Amino acid sequence: DNGMDRMEQLKAVLSLCLIFGVAFCLGSVVGHTVSVRDQAVMARPAQKDWGLSFQEDNKPPVADESMEQLAQYDAFYAENTTEKVLYLTFDCGYENGNTPAILDALKKHHVPAAFFIVGNYLEKNPDLVKRMRAEGHIIGNHSYHHPDMSQMGKEEFQKELAQLEDLYEQTTGEKMAKFYRPPQGKYSDNNLQLAKELGYRTIFWSLAYVDWKQEEQPTHEEAMSKLLKRVHPGAIVLLHNTSRTNGEILDEVLTKWEEMGYHFASLEELVSSGGREARSFFLTDNQENPVKSAAPT
């Protein structure tokens, strides 16, 4: 009986060893699998979508990143100031007839703006782009194909910007200004750093409204209400050139903002260390050589 008991005990011990051994191996395999997956996730840049929370009329919104966080990448979404200065920017994905009216309103009010264009826009509308430059506006880089750039590596990211730079230089005979706006508002810390390394300033925004839906264009009243309530000192304004409403109300919006005490400056003035000395150029009737004054530094 004692021999049998010892045999049973030995079997029990061996069984336990086998169970623990299998469990250990499985744990190691599962642990290794999780580790590899975690490494893959960690290696992939975290995609972010630029967003704003408008909480108080005529005050800066709560943004996804602080000005200090963005500053390390030469990126901006507004100017930290109490001065009633605005920076107008337009995203141009395609042309549907509203840009001439937008340019007319800007010219009437002597307002400098930045137009962020894509490859297709430049290919199909070279004369409009040349008019933008002739009237003193900045042409910014919105990428060539308007993809989600947030997950791109350096080579692919650089190619998207360089393709548009090359076409712009072929079309206009001048170098493109080094301002970048992330397509679709999607970005990562990684490509903010890549843009900085390529000499770009990334330009987000602090004032916008839903103006891009072609079948759901806001009424004049809806648009005016949002644009007048959301305006604040130092705002970078994002509007879409494809908006019929924007083309129709921009003259009135600029007038209202001026009546509220606002004036307008160029992105070049926002990022320059010397401040906004150049603003006086745009506030006079001297439009003889606006291209030179608005040329990239």
List the predicted regions and their residue ranges.
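Alpha-helical scaffold elements lining the catalytic groove of polysaccharide deacetylases
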Residues: E65, N98, P147-T172, K186-P233, ...
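Short low-complexity, flexible loop/linker segments enriched in glycine and/or proline
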Residues: V129-M132, E155-F157, Q217-H220, R279-T284
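Catalytic grooves of carbohydrate-active enzymes
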Residues: V231-E268
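N-terminal pre-catalytic segment of deacetylase/amide-hydrolase enzymes
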Residues: D5-T89, E95-L103, K108, E222, ...
